[in-house]
Amino acid sequence: IILCLFIFGSQEINKNKKRLNKVNEKIFVKVISPNFDLQYGLNKKKIEERFNKLIRYSNPDKDKKTLFIWPEGVFSGYSYKEILIFKKLIKRNFSKKHLIIFGANRLNIESGNFYNSMLVVDNNLEIIKKYDKRKLVPFGEFLPFENILKVFGLKKITEGHGSFIKGNKNNNIIIDNLNILPLICYEVIFTDLIQKSDLNTNLIVNISEDGWFGKTIGPDQHFVKSIFRSIENDTFFLRSTNKGVSAIIDNKGNIAKRLNRNEAGNIEF
């Protein structure tokens, strides 16, 4: 029995390694954890400082095809349109072989609605792919019964625009051979989002601002949910957070690489 378990275990490990190689054989991936303080009212200079730190942690090789994953909330209060003033900074440091995933507030010009979005941009900061968060945090990202409560001066607690509108599409992000299921922040706790996703999903990417939790166990709980989702769906999981645990988790729930809470740097996939 012990011999059978050993043989089966060895086969599973080898199978995982082959699957890992197949998932990322065409594009190199870097997961970034910047460890920014949670701050409101950031000015242009502070946002530029954040960009420069993200670039330093990304350490881009202009000749290497790479997907960089930055967390949610790194441009606190700034919308996608407002950070376009840093286009030259991105173009100077990244090449046409690079794509960047990050979280930002996005305005739909036609409807006037704001979304909490995961964006995939090129080295011109042009949006290549996007995903709008579907599970919004009550009072944090939208105000329930807003038309009634705003009469009493109530508003959502997060900085920036009025209530976000939830996304209505279960859209995967396709990049080369990566079929990515995008999850923003606490969407990782909702199993139904993953169960209803594209059957060809071969990678789950979760970006999160975990600074909201402070010194509580919140970031650790978020991280544990990521492990559960990878096992339940037999899928590799990449997690990029600010102030939380960033990690690469294989399809069996094993932690291949990680950056701990309040640790800055990058991990490679």
Task: Please provide the spans of the model-predicted regions.
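Enzyme catalytic cores with a strong preference for nitrogen-chemistry domains
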Residues: 1-269
